[in-house]
Amino acid sequence: MSGSDTAPFLSQADDTDDGPAPGTPGLPGSMGNPKSEDPAVPDQEGLQRITGLSSGHSALIVAVLCYINLLNYMDRFTVAGVLPDIEQFFDIGDGSSGLIQTVFISSYMVLAPVFGYLGDRYNRKYLMCGGIAFWSLVTLGSSFIPRERFWLLLLTRGLVGVGEASYSTIAPTLIADLFVADQRSRMLSVFYFAIPVGSGLGYIAGSKVKDVAGDWHWALRVTPGLGVLAVVLLFLVVQEPPRGAVERHSDSPPLNPTSWWADLRALARNPSFILSSLGFTAVAFVTGSLALWAPAFLLRSRVVLGETPPCLPGDSCSSSDSLIFGLITCLTGVLGVGLGVEISRRLRRTNPRADPLVCAAGLLGSAPFLFLALACARGSIVATYIFIFIGETLLSMNWAIVADILLYVVIPTRRSTAEAFQIVLSHLLGDAGSPYLIGSISDRLRRDWPPSFLSEFRALQFSLMLCAFVGALGGAAFLGTAIFIESDRRQAQLHVQGLLPETGPTDDRIVVPQRGRSTRVPVSSVLI
Protein backbone atom coordinates (compact mmCIF):
# COMPACT_ATOMS: atom_id res chain seq x y z
CA MET A 1 0.00 0.00 0.00
CA SER A 2 1.06 3.55 -0.57
CA GLY A 3 1.42 6.06 2.24
CA SER A 4 -1.98 7.50 1.43
CA ASP A 5 -3.60 4.08 1.68
CA THR A 6 -2.52 3.71 5.27
CA ALA A 7 -4.03 7.00 6.42
CA PRO A 8 -6.97 6.85 8.85
CA PHE A 9 -10.30 6.37 7.10
CA LEU A 10 -11.84 9.32 8.96
CA SER A 11 -9.97 12.22 10.55
CA GLN A 12 -10.86 13.96 13.78
CA ALA A 13 -13.14 16.98 13.59
CA ASP A 14 -11.85 20.50 13.92
CA ASP A 15 -14.05 23.58 14.26
CA THR A 16 -17.34 21.72 14.48
CA ASP A 17 -16.16 19.09 16.92
CA ASP A 18 -15.67 20.02 20.52
CA GLY A 19 -13.22 17.17 21.01
CA PRO A 20 -12.46 15.64 24.35
CA ALA A 21 -13.54 17.52 27.38
CA PRO A 22 -10.98 19.18 29.60
CA GLY A 23 -9.26 16.64 31.76
CA THR A 24 -9.81 13.82 29.29
CA PRO A 25 -7.28 11.02 29.82
CA GLY A 26 -4.80 10.81 27.03
CA LEU A 27 -4.11 14.53 26.79
CA PRO A 28 -0.93 15.32 28.68
CA GLY A 29 -1.46 17.89 31.35
CA SER A 30 -5.02 18.50 30.18
CA MET A 31 -6.98 21.20 31.89
CA GLY A 32 -8.98 20.37 34.95
CA ASN A 33 -5.81 18.99 36.47
CA PRO A 34 -2.94 20.52 34.56
CA LYS A 35 0.30 18.63 34.67
CA SER A 36 -1.39 15.70 36.30
CA GLU A 37 -0.06 12.18 36.51
CA ASP A 38 -1.59 11.46 33.14
CA PRO A 39 -0.81 8.03 31.67
CA ALA A 40 -0.04 9.72 28.35
CA VAL A 41 2.79 11.72 29.90
CA PRO A 42 5.97 9.69 29.37
CA ASP A 43 7.88 8.55 32.44
CA GLN A 44 11.65 8.85 32.74
CA GLU A 45 12.24 5.66 30.79
CA GLY A 46 9.84 6.82 28.10
CA LEU A 47 11.59 10.18 27.81
CA GLN A 48 14.95 8.45 27.36
CA ARG A 49 13.52 6.22 24.65
CA ILE A 50 11.93 9.14 22.78
CA THR A 51 14.83 11.60 22.98
CA GLY A 52 17.64 9.05 22.79
CA LEU A 53 19.30 10.78 25.76
CA SER A 54 19.76 9.66 29.35
CA SER A 55 18.29 11.78 32.14
CA GLY A 56 21.82 12.78 33.16
CA HIS A 57 22.69 13.90 29.64
CA SER A 58 19.46 15.92 29.37
CA ALA A 59 20.23 17.62 32.69
CA LEU A 60 23.76 18.37 31.46
CA ILE A 61 22.33 19.98 28.32
CA VAL A 62 20.15 22.22 30.49
CA ALA A 63 23.20 23.11 32.59
CA VAL A 64 25.10 24.22 29.46
CA LEU A 65 22.10 26.26 28.28
CA CYS A 66 21.86 27.87 31.73
CA TYR A 67 25.55 28.79 31.62
CA ILE A 68 25.12 30.49 28.25
CA ASN A 69 21.94 32.26 29.39
CA LEU A 70 23.81 33.55 32.43
CA LEU A 71 26.66 34.70 30.21
CA ASN A 72 24.32 36.54 27.83
CA TYR A 73 22.75 38.57 30.63
CA MET A 74 26.09 39.09 32.35
CA ASP A 75 27.42 40.73 29.18
CA ARG A 76 24.29 42.80 28.69
CA PHE A 77 24.44 44.37 32.17
CA THR A 78 28.19 44.79 32.40
CA VAL A 79 27.65 48.03 30.47
CA ALA A 80 25.12 49.24 33.06
CA GLY A 81 27.62 48.50 35.83
CA VAL A 82 30.13 50.97 34.37
CA LEU A 83 27.65 53.42 32.81
CA PRO A 84 28.82 56.52 34.73
CA ASP A 85 32.37 55.85 33.49
CA ILE A 86 31.14 55.43 29.91
CA GLU A 87 29.24 58.73 30.13
CA GLN A 88 32.35 60.45 31.40
CA PHE A 89 34.71 58.81 28.85
CA PHE A 90 32.59 59.69 25.81
CA ASP A 91 31.23 62.95 27.31
CA ILE A 92 27.56 62.04 26.70
CA GLY A 93 24.29 62.73 28.53
CA ASP A 94 21.49 60.50 29.78
CA GLY A 95 19.72 60.38 26.41
CA SER A 96 22.81 59.14 24.56
CA SER A 97 23.55 56.66 27.35
CA GLY A 98 20.08 55.19 26.93
CA LEU A 99 20.86 54.64 23.25
CA ILE A 100 23.52 52.05 24.16
CA GLN A 101 20.87 49.66 25.43
CA THR A 102 18.26 50.74 22.88
CA VAL A 103 20.52 50.00 19.89
CA PHE A 104 21.41 46.57 21.26
CA ILE A 105 17.79 45.65 21.95
CA SER A 106 16.66 46.96 18.55
CA SER A 107 19.18 44.74 16.75
CA TYR A 108 18.23 41.79 18.93
CA MET A 109 14.57 42.43 18.17
CA VAL A 110 15.06 42.61 14.39
CA LEU A 111 17.15 39.44 14.24
CA ALA A 112 14.95 37.34 16.56
CA PRO A 113 12.34 36.46 13.87
CA VAL A 114 15.13 35.36 11.52
CA PHE A 115 16.53 32.92 14.06
CA GLY A 116 13.01 31.93 15.09
CA TYR A 117 12.29 30.86 11.51
CA LEU A 118 15.61 29.04 11.23
CA GLY A 119 15.22 27.42 14.66
CA ASP A 120 11.93 25.77 13.67
CA ARG A 121 13.50 24.25 10.55
CA TYR A 122 17.25 23.69 10.95
CA ASN A 123 19.74 22.30 13.46
CA ARG A 124 19.44 24.44 16.57
CA LYS A 125 22.82 23.47 18.01
CA TYR A 126 24.81 24.85 15.06
CA LEU A 127 22.73 28.03 14.90
CA MET A 128 23.57 28.76 18.53
CA CYS A 129 27.27 27.96 18.07
CA GLY A 130 27.63 30.40 15.17
CA GLY A 131 25.70 33.18 16.89
CA ILE A 132 27.62 32.98 20.18
CA ALA A 133 31.01 32.87 18.42
CA PHE A 134 30.12 36.05 16.50
CA TRP A 135 28.83 37.72 19.66
CA SER A 136 32.07 36.99 21.54
CA LEU A 137 34.20 38.48 18.77
CA VAL A 138 32.14 41.68 18.52
CA THR A 139 32.02 42.17 22.30
CA LEU A 140 35.80 41.97 22.49
CA GLY A 141 36.13 44.49 19.67
CA SER A 142 33.83 46.97 21.45
CA SER A 143 36.37 47.33 24.27
CA PHE A 144 38.96 49.01 22.02
CA ILE A 145 36.91 51.98 20.75
CA PRO A 146 38.49 55.45 21.19
CA ARG A 147 36.59 58.28 22.93
CA GLU A 148 35.82 60.19 19.71
CA ARG A 149 34.02 57.16 18.19
CA PHE A 150 30.92 56.80 20.35
CA TRP A 151 28.93 55.85 17.24
CA LEU A 152 31.20 52.82 16.83
CA LEU A 153 30.33 51.67 20.36
CA LEU A 154 26.65 51.87 19.39
CA LEU A 155 27.34 49.84 16.24
CA THR A 156 29.19 47.06 18.06
CA ARG A 157 26.55 46.84 20.79
CA GLY A 158 23.98 46.49 18.03
CA LEU A 159 25.92 43.61 16.45
CA VAL A 160 25.99 41.84 19.82
CA GLY A 161 22.27 41.28 19.24
CA VAL A 162 23.14 38.58 16.68
CA GLY A 163 24.40 36.22 19.35
CA GLU A 164 21.58 36.88 21.78
CA ALA A 165 18.91 36.45 19.09
CA SER A 166 20.42 33.14 17.96
CA TYR A 167 20.28 31.81 21.49
CA SER A 168 17.20 33.25 23.22
CA THR A 169 14.75 32.13 20.54
CA ILE A 170 16.06 28.56 20.42
CA ALA A 171 17.24 27.45 23.87
CA PRO A 172 13.78 27.23 25.55
CA THR A 173 12.51 25.04 22.72
CA LEU A 174 15.32 22.55 23.33
CA ILE A 175 14.24 22.27 26.97
CA ALA A 176 10.64 21.77 25.82
CA ASP A 177 11.76 18.85 23.64
CA LEU A 178 13.64 17.19 26.52
CA PHE A 179 11.07 17.39 29.34
CA VAL A 180 7.31 17.48 29.92
CA ALA A 181 4.86 18.53 32.63
CA ASP A 182 6.33 19.41 36.05
CA GLN A 183 9.83 18.43 34.94
CA ARG A 184 9.67 21.04 32.21
CA SER A 185 8.49 23.73 34.63
CA ARG A 186 11.35 22.95 37.00
CA MET A 187 13.96 22.97 34.25
CA LEU A 188 12.61 26.25 32.90
CA SER A 189 12.83 27.76 36.37
CA VAL A 190 16.48 26.68 36.57
CA PHE A 191 17.08 28.11 33.10
CA TYR A 192 15.50 31.45 34.00
CA PHE A 193 17.39 31.68 37.28
CA ALA A 194 20.30 32.59 35.01
CA ILE A 195 18.64 35.86 33.96
CA PRO A 196 18.70 37.67 37.31
CA VAL A 197 21.89 35.94 38.42
CA GLY A 198 23.63 36.83 35.17
CA SER A 199 22.31 40.38 35.34
CA GLY A 200 23.58 40.78 38.88
CA LEU A 201 26.95 39.28 37.98
CA GLY A 202 27.16 41.76 35.11
CA TYR A 203 26.89 44.68 37.52
CA ILE A 204 29.31 43.08 39.96
CA ALA A 205 31.88 41.94 37.39
CA GLY A 206 31.73 45.24 35.53
CA SER A 207 32.31 47.36 38.61
CA LYS A 208 34.92 45.10 40.24
CA VAL A 209 36.96 44.46 37.08
CA LYS A 210 37.00 48.22 36.48
CA ASP A 211 38.25 48.79 40.03
CA VAL A 212 40.97 46.14 39.75
CA ALA A 213 42.16 47.15 36.26
CA GLY A 214 41.65 50.88 36.77
CA ASP A 215 39.95 51.05 33.35
CA TRP A 216 36.30 50.36 32.49
CA HIS A 217 37.29 48.89 29.08
CA TRP A 218 38.49 45.71 30.78
CA ALA A 219 34.95 45.06 32.03
CA LEU A 220 33.98 44.29 28.40
CA ARG A 221 36.84 41.80 27.97
CA VAL A 222 35.65 39.22 30.50
CA THR A 223 32.66 37.65 28.74
CA PRO A 224 34.25 37.01 25.29
CA GLY A 225 36.61 34.40 26.76
CA LEU A 226 33.70 32.76 28.56
CA GLY A 227 31.81 32.84 25.26
CA VAL A 228 34.48 30.72 23.58
CA LEU A 229 34.04 28.14 26.34
CA ALA A 230 30.28 28.24 25.73
CA VAL A 231 30.75 27.39 22.05
CA VAL A 232 32.97 24.41 22.96
CA LEU A 233 30.41 23.13 25.49
CA LEU A 234 27.57 23.52 22.99
CA PHE A 235 29.46 21.56 20.37
CA LEU A 236 30.52 18.73 22.69
CA VAL A 237 27.51 18.33 25.02
CA VAL A 238 24.29 19.46 23.33
CA GLN A 239 22.43 17.08 21.02
CA GLU A 240 19.37 17.89 18.95
CA PRO A 241 16.21 16.16 20.31
CA PRO A 242 13.29 15.46 17.95
CA ARG A 243 10.83 18.37 17.90
CA GLY A 244 7.64 17.72 19.86
CA ALA A 245 8.17 13.96 20.17
CA VAL A 246 7.81 13.90 23.98
CA GLU A 247 4.30 15.37 23.70
CA ARG A 248 2.85 13.00 21.10
CA HIS A 249 1.23 9.61 21.48
CA SER A 250 3.16 6.79 19.87
CA ASP A 251 0.40 6.44 17.25
CA SER A 252 0.10 10.18 16.56
CA PRO A 253 1.18 11.47 13.14
CA PRO A 254 4.45 13.43 13.07
CA LEU A 255 4.29 17.21 13.24
CA ASN A 256 5.52 18.87 10.06
CA PRO A 257 6.43 22.56 9.77
CA THR A 258 3.88 24.77 8.06
CA SER A 259 4.65 27.91 6.08
CA TRP A 260 5.91 30.96 7.93
CA TRP A 261 2.74 32.90 7.12
CA ALA A 262 0.60 30.05 8.42
CA ASP A 263 2.62 30.13 11.64
CA LEU A 264 2.07 33.87 11.99
CA ARG A 265 -1.66 33.57 11.37
CA ALA A 266 -1.98 30.84 13.98
CA LEU A 267 -0.04 32.87 16.55
CA ALA A 268 -2.10 35.99 15.83
CA ARG A 269 -5.27 33.98 16.56
CA ASN A 270 -3.89 32.73 19.88
CA PRO A 271 -5.12 35.23 22.52
CA SER A 272 -3.17 33.62 25.36
CA PHE A 273 0.07 34.03 23.42
CA ILE A 274 -0.71 37.65 22.46
CA LEU A 275 -1.87 38.79 25.91
CA SER A 276 0.89 37.01 27.83
CA SER A 277 3.40 38.58 25.44
CA LEU A 278 1.93 42.02 26.15
CA GLY A 279 2.19 41.34 29.88
CA PHE A 280 5.78 40.26 29.42
CA THR A 281 6.38 43.46 27.46
CA ALA A 282 5.57 45.41 30.62
CA VAL A 283 8.09 43.27 32.52
CA ALA A 284 10.70 44.04 29.86
CA PHE A 285 9.93 47.77 30.00
CA VAL A 286 10.38 47.93 33.76
CA THR A 287 13.42 45.64 33.99
CA GLY A 288 15.10 47.35 31.04
CA SER A 289 14.66 50.77 32.62
CA LEU A 290 15.84 49.65 36.05
CA ALA A 291 18.74 47.65 34.64
CA LEU A 292 20.32 50.68 33.03
CA TRP A 293 19.23 53.50 35.32
CA ALA A 294 18.91 52.08 38.85
CA PRO A 295 22.66 52.20 39.69
CA ALA A 296 22.94 55.76 38.33
CA PHE A 297 19.80 56.79 40.24
CA LEU A 298 21.10 55.28 43.48
CA LEU A 299 24.44 57.07 43.01
CA ARG A 300 22.66 60.41 42.51
CA SER A 301 20.52 59.73 45.57
CA ARG A 302 23.59 59.14 47.72
CA VAL A 303 25.20 62.31 46.35
CA VAL A 304 22.13 64.35 47.33
CA LEU A 305 22.13 62.73 50.79
CA GLY A 306 25.82 63.58 51.17
CA GLU A 307 26.86 59.94 51.53
CA THR A 308 29.22 59.86 48.53
CA PRO A 309 31.11 62.45 46.44
CA PRO A 310 29.75 63.34 42.98
CA CYS A 311 31.21 61.82 39.82
CA LEU A 312 33.36 64.63 38.36
CA PRO A 313 35.34 64.69 35.08
CA GLY A 314 38.72 63.05 35.53
CA ASP A 315 37.65 61.05 38.57
CA SER A 316 36.57 57.41 38.76
CA CYS A 317 32.88 57.10 39.64
CA SER A 318 31.81 55.20 42.76
CA SER A 319 30.86 51.61 41.94
CA SER A 320 29.33 50.63 45.30
CA ASP A 321 25.76 51.11 44.09
CA SER A 322 26.36 48.91 41.03
CA LEU A 323 27.73 46.23 43.35
CA ILE A 324 24.81 46.44 45.79
CA PHE A 325 22.20 46.58 43.03
CA GLY A 326 23.86 43.59 41.37
CA LEU A 327 23.61 41.57 44.57
CA ILE A 328 19.95 42.58 44.97
CA THR A 329 19.25 41.57 41.37
CA CYS A 330 20.81 38.14 41.94
CA LEU A 331 18.96 37.47 45.18
CA THR A 332 15.57 38.80 44.09
CA GLY A 333 15.79 36.95 40.80
CA VAL A 334 16.47 33.58 42.39
CA LEU A 335 13.84 34.19 45.06
CA GLY A 336 11.24 35.56 42.63
CA VAL A 337 11.63 32.87 39.96
CA GLY A 338 11.54 30.12 42.57
CA LEU A 339 8.51 31.59 44.35
CA GLY A 340 6.63 32.13 41.10
CA VAL A 341 7.14 28.57 39.86
CA GLU A 342 6.34 26.95 43.21
CA ILE A 343 3.23 29.06 43.91
CA SER A 344 1.96 28.44 40.39
CA ARG A 345 2.65 24.70 40.61
CA ARG A 346 0.65 24.39 43.83
CA LEU A 347 -2.24 26.54 42.62
CA ARG A 348 -2.57 24.57 39.36
CA ARG A 349 -3.95 21.64 41.36
CA THR A 350 -7.15 23.58 41.99
CA ASN A 351 -7.04 26.42 39.46
CA PRO A 352 -6.08 25.80 35.80
CA ARG A 353 -5.63 29.57 35.35
CA ALA A 354 -2.94 29.78 38.02
CA ASP A 355 -0.05 30.68 35.70
CA PRO A 356 -1.39 33.99 34.32
CA LEU A 357 -2.94 34.89 37.69
CA VAL A 358 0.41 34.51 39.47
CA CYS A 359 2.04 36.66 36.76
CA ALA A 360 -0.65 39.31 37.21
CA ALA A 361 -0.21 39.31 40.98
CA GLY A 362 3.55 39.73 40.59
CA LEU A 363 3.29 42.74 38.29
CA LEU A 364 0.43 44.45 40.12
CA GLY A 365 2.20 43.88 43.43
CA SER A 366 5.56 45.22 42.22
CA ALA A 367 4.18 48.58 41.02
CA PRO A 368 3.55 50.22 44.43
CA PHE A 369 6.87 49.01 45.84
CA LEU A 370 8.81 50.44 42.90
CA PHE A 371 6.98 53.74 43.36
CA LEU A 372 7.83 53.76 47.08
CA ALA A 373 11.48 53.00 46.28
CA LEU A 374 11.66 56.10 44.10
CA ALA A 375 9.68 58.29 46.50
CA CYS A 376 11.85 57.39 49.51
CA ALA A 377 15.21 57.81 47.80
CA ARG A 378 15.77 61.38 49.00
CA GLY A 379 14.96 60.49 52.61
CA SER A 380 16.50 57.06 53.18
CA ILE A 381 18.68 55.01 50.87
CA VAL A 382 18.10 51.96 53.10
CA ALA A 383 14.32 52.18 52.62
CA THR A 384 14.90 52.54 48.88
CA TYR A 385 16.94 49.34 48.77
CA ILE A 386 14.28 47.48 50.79
CA PHE A 387 11.46 48.53 48.45
CA ILE A 388 13.58 47.72 45.38
CA PHE A 389 14.22 44.26 46.85
CA ILE A 390 10.50 43.58 47.32
CA GLY A 391 9.51 45.08 43.96
CA GLU A 392 12.13 43.15 41.99
CA THR A 393 11.22 39.89 43.76
CA LEU A 394 7.59 40.27 42.70
CA LEU A 395 8.63 41.28 39.18
CA SER A 396 10.89 38.22 38.82
CA MET A 397 7.99 35.83 39.50
CA ASN A 398 7.06 36.13 35.80
CA TRP A 399 10.14 34.88 33.98
CA ALA A 400 9.77 31.08 34.01
CA ILE A 401 5.95 31.11 34.08
CA VAL A 402 5.64 33.20 30.90
CA ALA A 403 8.01 30.82 29.12
CA ASP A 404 5.95 27.83 30.28
CA ILE A 405 2.73 29.46 29.06
CA LEU A 406 4.19 29.93 25.59
CA LEU A 407 5.37 26.33 25.41
CA TYR A 408 1.99 24.82 26.26
CA VAL A 409 -0.26 27.11 24.17
CA VAL A 410 1.93 26.89 21.02
CA ILE A 411 2.61 23.66 19.13
CA PRO A 412 6.27 22.46 18.89
CA THR A 413 6.81 23.34 15.22
CA ARG A 414 5.96 27.00 15.90
CA ARG A 415 7.72 27.54 19.21
CA SER A 416 10.93 29.15 17.98
CA THR A 417 8.85 31.51 15.84
CA ALA A 418 6.63 32.25 18.84
CA GLU A 419 9.69 32.87 21.03
CA ALA A 420 11.04 35.21 18.36
CA PHE A 421 7.88 37.26 18.07
CA GLN A 422 7.43 37.44 21.81
CA ILE A 423 10.96 38.84 21.90
CA VAL A 424 10.12 41.33 19.13
CA LEU A 425 6.95 42.51 20.84
CA SER A 426 8.42 42.71 24.33
CA HIS A 427 11.48 44.60 23.13
CA LEU A 428 9.73 46.81 20.57
CA LEU A 429 7.31 48.14 23.17
CA GLY A 430 9.48 47.29 26.18
CA ASP A 431 13.19 47.57 26.84
CA ALA A 432 14.25 48.63 23.33
CA GLY A 433 12.93 52.12 23.94
CA SER A 434 12.43 52.36 27.69
CA PRO A 435 16.07 53.20 28.63
CA TYR A 436 16.19 55.92 25.98
CA LEU A 437 12.70 57.15 26.90
CA ILE A 438 13.59 57.39 30.59
CA GLY A 439 16.87 59.17 29.77
CA SER A 440 15.17 61.60 27.38
CA ILE A 441 12.46 62.48 29.92
CA SER A 442 15.21 63.03 32.50
CA ASP A 443 17.14 65.34 30.14
CA ARG A 444 13.97 67.27 29.29
CA LEU A 445 13.11 67.82 32.96
CA ARG A 446 16.64 68.94 33.78
CA ARG A 447 16.47 71.69 31.17
CA ASP A 448 13.62 73.31 33.12
CA TRP A 449 15.56 73.42 36.40
CA PRO A 450 18.77 75.18 37.48
CA PRO A 451 21.84 72.92 37.06
CA SER A 452 22.57 71.06 40.30
CA PHE A 453 23.07 67.57 41.66
CA LEU A 454 19.56 67.78 43.12
CA SER A 455 18.01 68.55 39.73
CA GLU A 456 19.84 65.58 38.18
CA PHE A 457 18.44 63.34 40.91
CA ARG A 458 14.87 64.69 40.71
CA ALA A 459 14.75 64.46 36.91
CA LEU A 460 15.72 60.79 36.90
CA GLN A 461 13.44 60.10 39.87
CA PHE A 462 10.34 61.49 38.14
CA SER A 463 11.11 59.80 34.82
CA LEU A 464 11.52 56.37 36.47
CA MET A 465 8.06 56.63 38.04
CA LEU A 466 6.70 55.72 34.62
CA CYS A 467 7.78 52.14 35.39
CA ALA A 468 5.15 51.71 38.12
CA PHE A 469 2.36 52.72 35.73
CA VAL A 470 3.57 50.35 32.99
CA GLY A 471 3.78 47.51 35.51
CA ALA A 472 0.10 47.95 36.37
CA LEU A 473 -0.83 47.78 32.67
CA GLY A 474 1.11 44.53 32.35
CA GLY A 475 -0.81 43.04 35.26
CA ALA A 476 -4.05 43.80 33.42
CA ALA A 477 -2.76 41.96 30.32
CA PHE A 478 -2.08 38.82 32.38
CA LEU A 479 -5.58 39.01 33.86
CA GLY A 480 -6.83 38.96 30.27
CA THR A 481 -4.64 35.91 29.56
CA ALA A 482 -6.42 34.04 32.36
CA ILE A 483 -9.68 34.27 30.40
CA PHE A 484 -8.35 32.31 27.41
CA ILE A 485 -5.62 30.09 28.84
CA GLU A 486 -7.70 26.90 29.24
CA SER A 487 -9.11 26.80 25.72
CA ASP A 488 -5.83 27.74 24.03
CA ARG A 489 -3.88 25.09 25.90
CA ARG A 490 -6.45 22.44 25.03
CA GLN A 491 -6.31 23.43 21.34
CA ALA A 492 -2.53 22.99 21.32
CA GLN A 493 -2.80 19.58 22.99
CA LEU A 494 -5.36 18.36 20.46
CA HIS A 495 -3.16 19.54 17.60
CA VAL A 496 -0.06 17.77 18.93
CA GLN A 497 -2.01 14.51 19.31
CA GLY A 498 -3.18 14.73 15.69
CA LEU A 499 -6.79 15.32 16.72
CA LEU A 500 -6.92 18.80 15.22
CA PRO A 501 -5.15 18.61 11.84
CA GLU A 502 -4.24 21.62 9.74
CA THR A 503 -6.17 21.98 6.52
CA GLY A 504 -5.48 24.27 3.63
CA PRO A 505 -7.81 27.12 2.71
CA THR A 506 -8.97 25.32 -0.44
CA ASP A 507 -9.56 21.94 1.20
CA ASP A 508 -13.30 21.32 0.83
CA ARG A 509 -15.07 19.65 3.70
CA ILE A 510 -18.01 17.28 3.97
CA VAL A 511 -20.14 16.14 6.89
CA VAL A 512 -19.89 12.47 7.89
CA PRO A 513 -21.27 10.59 10.90
CA GLN A 514 -18.73 10.01 13.65
CA ARG A 515 -19.27 8.91 17.26
CA GLY A 516 -23.03 9.17 16.75
CA ARG A 517 -23.14 12.75 15.45
CA SER A 518 -22.34 14.73 12.32
CA THR A 519 -18.72 15.80 12.01
CA ARG A 520 -17.11 18.03 9.39
CA VAL A 521 -13.87 16.58 7.98
CA PRO A 522 -11.65 17.23 4.93
CA VAL A 523 -12.63 15.44 1.74
CA SER A 524 -9.11 14.00 1.46
CA SER A 525 -9.53 12.10 4.73
CA VAL A 526 -12.32 9.88 3.36
CA LEU A 527 -10.79 9.15 -0.04
CA ILE A 528 -9.17 5.72 -0.48
Curated annotation (Swiss-Prot):
Topology of the protein relative to the lipid bilayer: Multi-pass membrane protein
InterPro entries: MFS, MFS_dom, MFS_spinster-like, MFS_trans_sf
Residue numbers spanned by region Disordered: 1-44
Biological process, per Gene Ontology: lysophospholipid transport; phospholipid efflux; regulation of lysosomal lumen pH
Residues where Phosphoserine is found: S518
Major place of residence: membrane
Entry-linked CDD domains: MFS_spinster_like
Reaction catalysed by this enzyme: a 1-acyl-sn-glycero-3-phosphocholine(out) + H(+)(out) = a 1-acyl-sn-glycero-3-phosphocholine(in) + H(+)(in); 1-hexadecanoyl-sn-glycero-3-phosphocholine(out) + H(+)(out) = 1-hexadecanoyl-sn-glycero-3-phosphocholine(in) + H(+)(in); 1-(9Z-octadecenoyl)-sn-glycero-3-phosphocholine(out) + H(+)(out) = 1-(9Z-octadecenoyl)-sn-glycero-3-phosphocholine(in) + H(+)(in); 1-(5Z,8Z,11Z,14Z-eicosatetraenoyl)-sn-glycero-3-phosphocholine(out) + H(+)(out) = 1-(5Z,8Z,11Z,14Z-eicosatetraenoyl)-sn-glycero-3-phosphocholine(in) + H(+)(in)
GO cellular component: lysosomal membrane; membrane
Keywords: Lipid transport, Lysosome, Membrane, Phosphoprotein, Transmembrane, Transmembrane helix, Transport
Keyword Magnesium: no
Family membership noted in the UniProt record: Belongs to the major facilitator superfamily. Spinster (TC 2.A.1.49) family.
Protein name, entry field: Protein spinster homolog 1
